[in-house]
Amino acid sequence: MKKYDVIVIGAGHAGLEAAFATSNLNLQTALITLDEKGIGMMPCNPSIGGPAKGIVTREIDALGGIQGKAADATTMQMKILNSSKGPGVWAIRAQIDKIAYQRWFKQQIKQQKNLDLIIAEVSDLLVENNIVKGVVLSDQKIIQADYVIITTGTYLKSITHRGSVCVDEGADGTKNAKFLSDALVKLGFELIRLKTGTPARIKKDSIDFTNMILEPGTNQKIAFSHYHPVYKPYDEQLPCHIIYTNEQTHQIIRENLNKSAMYGGMISGIGPRYCPSIEDKIVKFSEKPRHQIFVEPESYELDSMYLGGFSTSMPIDVQEKMIRSLPGLENCEILKYAYAIEYDAIDPTQLYPSLESKLVNNLFFAGQINGTSGYEEAAAQGLMAAINVNQKYQNKEPVILGRDQAYIGVMIDDIVTKGVVEPYRLLTSRAEHRLALRNDNADDRLMKIGFEIGLLKPEVYDQYLNNLKQIKEILNWLKTTTVGQIDDLKFTTLKTNSYLIDYLKRPEIKLNDLLIYCPIKIEDEQIINKVQIQVKFEGYIKNQEENLKQLKRLNNIKLHAIVDYKEVPNISLETIDKLNKIKPLDLEQASRISGVNLTDIAMIKYYLERIKND
């Protein structure tokens, strides 16, 4: 068979991003997948974005990746989350048409140069002198390549669970990968067993939406892609809805806990802390009288609704009772029952920050096989693995994004340094530099890198530079124009010799209020938004950077005064659990614990200072 520069194993979100990046960088690429049905599949929530994750998709786009364009082209609803809070946590979320999303990617694959799609199962890796040389298919055919990127998602020896019923299959009834796990173990890789799950799907026409809380999209022009945006008109967007569980729901779950695959002992894999099953919520948060559920559309072409927040591994008969206890679903038709899925992943501490294996040269890993969760986290890793394959191909240093540079950098640093014990999910709280890692400035942080690598097209980078020039011109006008120079502003409470940039720092003043006097005519909302954030939050960003410098000098602070970390304010339950279990001696040791970030360290320091002064 033909020899390739790169083989990508798996055509999910990580694999697609990797394959398009390597082929766009003129590397001959083979994309191998078990089943065409799995290309770009969204087996769980049909959405892209959300807190931290939406910023990751913007970062992917800024580097020259493809996920943002795919999401913009196939969205059913767009929203800006956390808009009432500071810009450090603003995020875009899109409800995606999962049928259109897969179709979009399949069409792109057909048109893509340097990319061949192969439907087959990889059963082994071809390795000589600790260097990967290609793959062996299940029919014993060999495909040679200089580099291999493994992006197998949740398919390695995967098993689905509904109560005591276990099926040897992949997500949504697809094929699973039966042999590659053994091949990795043979090469010396340590594997971990993880678990995730997905809720039931309900027939839309059987739902009573009357008393549900409506969650519409936005009429603002927002998109993931910086300079190729596709906007979904508001009147074409599909609404989501919110309902809540009730005591009847909780009672059904409590009475049947022993039938749950997870609580009944059928599952050995560890599930995601930040996306727990509904039975996990009832057990761990027993004091809560209700839990929120999102009723969301899956496609313009499907009559199915997704129950976000209601995943379970209960048997089918119990699921029916649980679902029909929910408001509006009393008489619903269940199209597909929920299930949990167990799968193999590698311990990601066996990877360099480039995502290359420490055990086998030229072998890279990306996506859920690295212990992460989420389409966005997967795509980001696929992109970075592809970038670093190209860097190595050209005998260049790997591209390693810093924690102060991108959420992608935060994620990769976390997983390769600390490892994972449960599916890793990106959160804004994991980023100690989150005021600098905003939705609006992904292009400022990463487009130069994308352009220098060769992924970002020159015309896109030129447009970015032109925008940057306009931003500098506006900032210069604000810094050099006084209130007294504008007749309409002479009667404000500011002194007439005050500059407009100081006037803009007032919370009630918007940049658009001042631009009507500006000789530079700007209509691009993206530019206006960037300038406004830079001016209004300049002080906060500088303060955060200073605090981070101080935190680096805390290595010798001892923690023996803390008996129970529940007393420390504003740290997560995950952090409390791990600190109470490990009992670190000092802040340096605490900072190395998986899941403990610099924000947590700052809270511990604050608590120690407080009890010292009491």
UniProtKB/Swiss-Prot annotation:
NAD(+) binds at residues 271-285. It is found in: Cytoplasm. InterPro entries: FAD/NAD-bd_sf, GIDA_C_N, MnmG, MnmG-rel, MnmG-rel_CS, MnmG_C, MnmG_C_subdom, MnmG_C_subdom_sf. GO terms for biological process: tRNA methylation; tRNA wobble uridine modification. SMART domains: GIDA_assoc_3. Pfam families: GIDA (PF01134), GIDA_C_1st (PF21680), SAM_GIDA_C (PF13932). Its main location: cytoplasm. Its cofactor is FAD. GO terms for molecular function: flavin adenine dinucleotide binding. Coiled coil: none annotated. FAD binds at residues 10-15. One of its GO terms (cellular component) is cytosol. Gene3D superfamilies: FAD/NAD(P)-binding domain (3.50.50.60), GidA associated domain, C-terminal subdomain (1.10.150.570), tRNA uridine 5-carboxymethylaminomethyl modification enzyme MnmG/GidA (1.10.10.1800). PROSITE patterns: GIDA_1, GIDA_2. The keyword tRNA processing applies. NAD-binding protein involved in the addition of a carboxymethylaminomethyl (cmnm) group at the wobble position (U34) of certain tRNAs, forming tRNA-cmnm(5)s(2)U34. Homodimer. Heterotetramer of two MnmE and two MnmG subunits. Belongs to the MnmG family. This is tRNA uridine 5-carboxymethylaminomethyl modification enzyme MnmG.
